[in-house]
């Protein structure tokens, strides 16, 4: 599920058409592989009409594009955490999550809820009880390392939990660092340029997931020109911010030199189909493919697919 920017939202005004074009292209790449629904408000809908099938557009009002962060985690057993405000004011983040909650209630989206604070982007799991977050989760909830692990195990029924030092301090999300591509295969950015940090990350992953196969993937970082999306780290160059479904992996690419090697390593380590998604137009804003995607399955998915078709 994608959430279109509103034509009335001043924050996205400068990038509005770029985001819309990206979402259209991304949706077209999903069609035929997985189901997709795009949430649009009525004044924004004309920008999508005729460019994607009409029956994937659902007119509603969800207040932000970064759907990963304020929705639910784990499509198999959805849990809605309390959205933190790393990227906006507390008032804004409450409004954004409220718009989602009202939307989810309208369509009777089944989910558990918790008061624990977490952005969905700081939650990477294999859908089968192995979970990765960063120390930001500890700070936001004023928990020690062992308390944080226990809370996540209790709240999610998780078996194994890793809590990483984040590789950037703004959002401190784990989904720019790691990706579970198969039941037992975990990909992690190659941090060998910062050996001490690499050791810290690898030690925590190996200790937390003793039986998992852990594979490093090349990563390059870009910095935004001054004045462009100030306060956010660019997500350009991070191929692991991928959307992983039952049969497919939508991998962001950036027209950068390391893209092909990263894609090759991902392909070699999964039986799933790899679908590259050019993300150059949106990654400077601080997120890419996974950040822009909310994943639902089963009855929850059927309700939304049907609602879009019925409109």
Describe the residue ranges of each PLM region.
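Histidine/cysteine-enriched polar flanking segments
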Residues: 1-311
């Amino acid at each position: 599920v994608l959430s279109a920017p509103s034509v009335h939202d001043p924050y996205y005004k400068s990038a509005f058409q770029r985001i819309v074009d990206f979402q259209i292209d991304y949706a077209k790449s999903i069609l035929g592989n997985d189901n997709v629904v795009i949430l649009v408000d009525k004044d924004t809908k004309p920008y999508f009409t005729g460019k994607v099938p009409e029956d994937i557009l659902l007119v509603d009002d969800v207040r932000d594009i970064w759907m990963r962060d304020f929705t639910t985690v784990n499509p198999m057993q959805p849990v809605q955490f309390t959205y933190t405000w790393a990227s906006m004011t507390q008032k804004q983040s409450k409004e954004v999550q409220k718009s989602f909650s009202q939307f989810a209630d309208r369509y009777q989206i089944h989910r558990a809820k918790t008061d624990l604070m977490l952005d969905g982007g700081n939650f990477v799991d294999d859908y089968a009880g192995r979970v990765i977050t960063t120390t930001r989760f500890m700070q936001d909830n004023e928990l020690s390392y062992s308390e944080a692990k226990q809370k996540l195990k209790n709240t999610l029924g998780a078996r194994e939990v890793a809590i990483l030092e984040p590789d950037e301090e703004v959002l401190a999300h784990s989904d720019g660092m790691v990706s579970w591509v198969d039941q037992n295969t975990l990909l992690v950015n190659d941090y060998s340029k910062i050996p001490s940090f690499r050791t810290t990350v690898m030690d925590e992953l190996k200790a937390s997931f003793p039986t998992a196969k852990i594979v490093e993937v090349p990563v390059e970082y870009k910095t935004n020109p001054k004045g462009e999306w100030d306060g956010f780290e660019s997500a350009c160059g991070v191929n692991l911010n991928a959307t992983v479904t039952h049969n497919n992996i939508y991998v962001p690419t950036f027209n950068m030199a390391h893209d092909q090697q990263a894609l090759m390593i991902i392909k070699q380590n999964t039986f799933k189909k790899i679908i590259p998604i050019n993300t150059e137009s949106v990654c400077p804003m601080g997120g890419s493919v996974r950040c822009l995607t909310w994943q639902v399955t089963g009855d929850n998915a059927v309700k939304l697919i049907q609602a879009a078709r019925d409109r």
